[in-house]
């Protein structure tokens, strides 16, 4: 009898949601991983300038059906993060709320989660929080989810392992403070 392993919890930001819809990978990653996010990332993914040629339509029903959980973030969690890391104010609201939520939950090596973001400032802050090893790129998620090679190739550069690896190395070497 096969033992069903629990899905790995992966917290995603707005950009990862939008890129996974653009490339048609959302459902596949949600079937393979327990995808979670915060309300602000959902709000951001559902809005945008529809006249922008780069606009990506995100189907609310499909988005919500794929999520294992969506989390509200309190003002105290956001304020606490910004007070401890003032440069966090420079993050987009979705990434700020996502990192504030995770910090408020006490994420540590004892809690097995992954974080997927393609925002360099969010990666830097994740590093300062001691979470560099929790980061996973969208490319790795989709490759493990059985999508087509065409969907993987369609991912923009900052959703790929090479980009994330380069940023992590620069952070570890102190090139990016």
Language-model features, listed with the residues they occupy:
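Active-site-proximal, substrate-binding regions of enzyme catalytic domains
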Residues: 2-114, 123-124, 128-129, 136-149, ...
